[in-house]
Amino acid sequence: MKTVSIIGGTGYTGSELLRLLSNHDKVEVLNVTSRKEAGKKLTDFHPQVRNLRNYNDLEFQNIAPEDIDTDIVFCATPHGASMAIVPTLHEKGINIIDLSGDYRFEDIEMYESWYGLKHTGKIESAVYGLPELHREKIKKSKTIANPGCYPTGAILSMAPLVANDLVDERIIFDSKSGVSGAGVVASQTTHFPNVNENLGAYKITKHRHSPEIGKELEYLGNKRLKVSFTPHLLPVTRGILTTAHSYLKEDVSRVDVIEIYEEFYKDEFFVRIFEESMPSLTGVRGTNFCDIGGFEIDQHGRIVVVSAIDNLVKGASGQAIQNMNIIMGFDEKEGLSVGGMRP
């Protein structure tokens, strides 16, 4: 049995890690940290995991990184906090999955420009943890940068077309997310009276997930791309629905496109291709699946692909566990083989 620590256990991603790991037969959670809630019972804060595993016996702890001695550490901390923690854990040889944006960019200047933070803890060996594209690199690394929620759904929706050089350099992503993607701390934007029965766009050209999407697709296609991304906030708790648009470079049919997607993802359990029906938020709610469908081509050669993920699972904690399974040599599906909560 491998041991796990969760640094930052009071947010939504920490909560989801606890829920999902309760079904994992190969690991045991020993430490869950929180400076603010230190000394309080874990299940008083997270009643949804009461009576599961050893959780009734755990209290939040305020542990320094140098005092952590588990096999695996999930850093479920805000952007900017992980870079102060991860280098110490890395030096100790601990397997790390960081759910913040701190290690998603090899180009530190790009990170600093988009996140507005000075990066102080670069680790050259950190690997971008999108298993469908980087599985072999993940296997060889001990520090994994878990992808962002929006980038996960966006990249997977267009990866087969980019990899096969079937679309031109213009790719547009329109994504709509549930409110939990904004984090556990409420704001004017996410306050119930403001978000309920409403739909709004935000950071329409300058969201920090834009360069993350772009760099991964450019790496895959080995060419420069003009990636545009606009997010929207939905009055729902979970889920991201992404509509991706680009223009085909050659005359291919919808059947051809579907075959390309099925071939590209033929060994990917967590990617489901919908030939006829459309992906939905309820179909992936609570799961680690990315559902992809649409594949419609209009009279101008514009192709439209739709993807759906749960932003807290495949977009965060579930993908983090998938990455842990890979680096630890576990079955990749361990702890993650559940269907969507539909309706």
From Swiss-Prot:
It is found in: Cytoplasm. The active site is at C149. GO terms for biological process: L-arginine biosynthetic process. GO terms for cellular component: cytoplasm. Keywords: Amino-acid biosynthesis, Arginine biosynthesis, Cytoplasm, NADP, Oxidoreductase. It comes from the Archaea. It catalyses: N-acetyl-L-glutamate 5-semialdehyde + phosphate + NADP(+) = N-acetyl-L-glutamyl 5-phosphate + NADPH + H(+). Its main location: cytoplasm. GO terms for molecular function: N-acetyl-gamma-glutamyl-phosphate reductase activity; NAD binding; NADP+ binding. Gene3D superfamilies: Dihydrodipicolinate Reductase, domain 2, NAD(P)-binding Rossmann-like Domain. Belongs to the NAGSA dehydrogenase family. Type 1 subfamily. This is N-acetyl-gamma-glutamyl-phosphate reductase. It comes from Methanococcus maripaludis (strain C5 / ATCC BAA-1333).
